[in-house]
Structures are given as structure tokens and as C-alpha cells.
Amino acid sequence: MKVGTLLRLGLSDIAGRAAGLAALYAGRADDPQVVLRPSYDEVVDQARSLEAAGFDAVFTIESSHDVFLPLALAASVSGLEVMTNVAIALPRSPLHLAHAAYDLQLISEGRFALGIGSQVRPVIERAFSAPWSHPVERMREIVLATKAILACWQGGGPLEFSGRFYRHTFMNPGFSPGPNPYGIPPVLIGALGPRMTTMTAEVADGLLVHPFSSERFVRERVLPAVDAGLGAAGRDRASFSLVSNVIVATGRTDAEMAVAEAGVRALLAFYGSTPTYRPLMELEGCLDLHLELNRLAKDGRFADMATRIDDGVLETFAVRARPGEVAKAIAARYGDVADRVNLYLPYPAGTDLFAAAATGFAAG
């Protein structure tokens, strides 16, 4: 099973970043470089170290830094596959996505995958100041339009894509980079709900399963929706990639495990409070917990939220294991359905811990 992990730029755990920003803005700290530690030199070092540790891919998420730039550095100094997981698509034009995908495919010599997602309405409207409507239909057109643009560049001929939301019918030599010597990169979608997942299986090259998930959710909700989409499009499973993003709590010592579990509990509490993920919480019998977390979030009681994530909830939505057992635990859940897994460790962790976690995958 292929295994990738997050390419970090600066302080990546939510709790630590929130505390660091609060200290900076309150005047209790005066050096963002020390508090948040953004460094592109770190990206280069990580890429080399993670490849040596046994990972075959790294991914970025669209959060506090650009989602594409770190991958250009990682690809240029390693043989790792690189992917966005995910780039937020709705605020962007398909032409923007196509250019970024083309260039990263070129820089990586054919090792890039474009992962895109819709995000949720408040983020699109209030953070990106972009319109939100018909997310499933828009994402379908974004995939088809991006593929049409890349195909136009690859094979020549006119660009002819006309949809309800996007229209691309003009491409002159000044805008076209020409054929990519490494071919057209795959386009994957991060999806959660049944309509988005079914659409993904109809038109995209693969599905990025949301990290806030569970084995039951994947088997009872995700896979049937994938099968429905593949069937509607007349596609077979071999033409489609399923990537499981898995939240992992791991550590070689009890102290490391305590740090890991604290970070995972904070992340699960954040996800669990969000109305978007209510169907998942309901499926796992956690509706009351979801409602409580949502109330705490609205009251600004963020420090209290993680205390509501007990061991049972943690082990439902994340994998908790010592490094040498991580691969075995993930394989038991998703080994028969996932083409790749991406490990998500939402807490401070050195490359040596990542290497220890990757060992089991290399052995398998």
C-alpha cells in the first residue's frame, strides 16, 4: 500500500498555531519566526527526510500557506509523488488550476496529482469572498473544464467547454504551454456527502476520503456512492483511485503518545462540532456529542471541547497505535479498499517519528 503524509510549513497543529497567534497579537511574543516557524528551507529538508524514511508521497492542505508552492520545492529535491489534498476549487478558475497542475507535473516529472475540494459555504463566502451555490454541479464542471484545458494543451485543437457555470472557448498560443512531456496529471476530488462522492466517481480520476471519517462510514456510505458513480459513467474500479486520509495518534514513548492524543482530540473536537459532519457523527451514534461540541464552539469554549473526546470516540475516527503498528492498524481498516493512504499527524512530530510510522508500510 502506498503511503504519503503532510508536507508541513511552520507550526501546523491547530492548538499550537492558535496559541502562538494569540501571543503575537497580544504582545506577549515579538518574533513570528520563532512562534510560527514558517520556513521553506524546512520544506526541502522534510521532503528529503520523508523520502529517506520510506514515504512515497507528500501532500499539502490549503490553510495558512499557499497550497501549490511547497510542492514545487518538494518535487525538485526528491523523487516523491506530490499532491494537493486539497486545493480549494470554487474560488479559482479552471484555467488557474490547469496552469498550476501543468507546471507541477512538469517540475515533478510526472509525479503530481491535483486534488481539489469545495470547502464549506462559510469559508467560501466569508474567507475567500467567492459565491457559493450548487457545489456538486460546480465541482463537476471544474473537473471537466480543467481536463478540457489540459487536453487542449496536450493535443492541440480548439478549446470547447460550455457548462452552466464555466465556459472556456478561447485558447491562443500565448496562453498555451503546449504538450506536457509527462502527460496530463490526474484530478481527484475530496468529497464527503453522497452526491459529491457519486459525482467524483463519474468524472474524476480518484476520491480523497476526508480525514474525519470512520471505517463504518467508508464501507457503508462512501463505497456505495463510488460504485453508483462508476456504474453511471460505465467505468470500472481499476480506472479510479481511492485515497484514504487517516488521522493518526502515535508515539514511541508514553510522553509522545500523550502529545499525539492531545492533538488528535483537539482536531476531532473541531470536526465533530461542525454541522457539515453531522451525518458522520449520527452514523457513529455521536449525535449528542456533536450537539454539545457545537454549543461549546459557539460559546468560544474551545479548550473544553477536546475533553469531550473520549478514547472510544478517538479510536472510531482516528487510528491510535505505536509506530510499528500503524501500518497494520490502517490495513485492517482500509487495506482492501484503499489504493493509497495518507497519514495526518495533527501535532508536533519529528521526522524520526514519521520514519518509525512508515516502517510498517515498507515492510508490507
Where are the model-predicted features located?
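Conserved, mostly hydrophobic/aromatic
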Residues: 54, 74, 104, 146, ...
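Hydrophobic faces of well-ordered beta-strands that scaffold small-molecule active sites
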Residues: 3-7, 32-34, 57-60, 82-85, ...
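Alpha-helix-loop-beta-strand connector modules within alpha/beta enzyme cores
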Residues: 70-87, 91, 142, 358-364
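Short, acidic/polar
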Residues: 37-49, 100, 191-199, 264, ...
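Catalytic cores of alpha/beta
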Residues: 94-103, 251-262
